[in-house]
Amino acid sequence: TPAPTHIPTMASIPATDDLPAYLAPLPARLETLTLRLVWVVVAVNLAGTVFGFWYYRFQLGNTPLVMWPVVPDSPTVTLFMIASLVSWKLGRSRSWLHALAFVGNLKYGLWVVVVQFTINDVLTAGDPYYWFLVVGHLGMALQALVIHRYAEFTVPAVGAAVTWFGFNDVVDYFLPIVGDYHHTYFGPHLVSVGDHDVLAHDVAAAAAVCLTMLATFLALSIRVRRLEARGRDRGRG
């Protein structure tokens, strides 16, 4: 008799949380629709991930191999998003993976939007490609705001995420360990090639650090609110 084949149980969509708007700003119906279309979202992220690694091909070619993990920021975090969604849907959730996806997609989704408006001057550049980047990365930030529906942002998991993305900020802008700074190449408007004393470098660095802090604060705030709610429920019981 052949051994039975194990078929993973697909996770159901979790109920909504009673979170304040600053922690869960998307309408509950939109969150639920996103989770219902999880495989579509995975496919879109997969396409974006492939494009993202292709986009970084020249920068990777100029970067020592050991530092490659810190260069392709956006495709790396969309890969985290894919892994987060798939692990949840297949009933194999990993808190650290969800935290990496949340912090990373929120951070780099918003970071690219900031860069396009402050450095690449998207409003006057007249380049449709810049607007493509704005829309695509705004979508990354928005999808991060759905993760709380199925994720537990434990303190160790958030700690792992902030350690990774904090390290990324350090080697991107402040202390390159091997070779030069590893931040994403900027557009031509405020940047002189190879010159890290220009305003664009400071703007990008400030945005990256602030967004790392913001995403960490939001993840931990969601954790605190849930613990408070559970405490109230136990008190009523």
Residues covered by each model-derived region:
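Selected alpha-helical membrane-embedding segments in polytopic membrane proteins
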Residues: G48-R92
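Membrane-interface transmembrane-helix boundary segments in multi-pass integral membrane proteins
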Residues: D180-T216, L220-S221
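Juxtamembrane "helix-exit" motif on the non-cytosolic side of transmembrane helices
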Residues: G52-G61, V113-T124, Y173-G179
